[in-house]
Amino acid sequence: MTNELPYDFMKAEKSAAELLRKYGVETPEHIRLEDMAYDLGVRIVEAPLKGAAARLLRYGKNATIRVSNAERYSTRRRFSVAHELGHFMLYHGHSIEFVCSDFDMHDWYQAKGNERIANAFAGELLLPRFLVEKRCDVKEVNFEPVKAIADEFQTSLTATAIRFIRFCPEMCAVLFSMDSKVKWVYKGNDFWPYIRIGKSLDKRTLAYFFFQGKTLPNDPEDVDAEAWLDSDRLGDLEEVVEHSIGFSRLGAVLTLIWIRP
């Protein structure tokens, strides 16, 4: 799937962009979620949440966002708050309560329906296009610029990688794998090869070694193109650049694939 967005996504991003303009955001440091929420009539509290990462309770024009107090990572907490603000601003459904599981938060791009739209809102709110796009104009695709953006904007590597692929002018894609299988793929507009969701990782990929208990290399490496891509559609393409990072806590791998010019 390329990064051409459906109408609901564009509407969500527009709503987030309007919020950023309202509060005069000009730098990453200006994205103060708690201050925005307070002004919007939304209270943020931490509380035990069984089976949920966050919960939005709406009452009239106001709301409370409950964030799991078990969440140890500030980047995930920020995404949870931004995600719930998306539900609040976009008036999702008629229920007064929305419960978002850790699955909804973890599968940034794989989520369905309103969860996916709230993720789009959160992506623009935390990683605004007008600030991020120029930082994605790189000559070589790897996780170094992604990490730099994530550190600057206090965002997760997964959310940042998706925005990076969205705006990077190079031919690239980001993949997420669990249980030695490709779970989801997000491709840049010019990334033409097909990558099948659900395919078992080829033994020639770097990501495969993570699930064999081996340490992934720190740097990108050239791998056979057909190890990742549909071999019937590759033409003269023989190699791609792969950079993979493993998450031991999640049992997952995030991978950048780049086709050199």
Language-model region placement:
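Active-site hotspot residues in diverse enzymes, especially metal/ion-binding acidic/histidine motifs
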Residues: 1-261
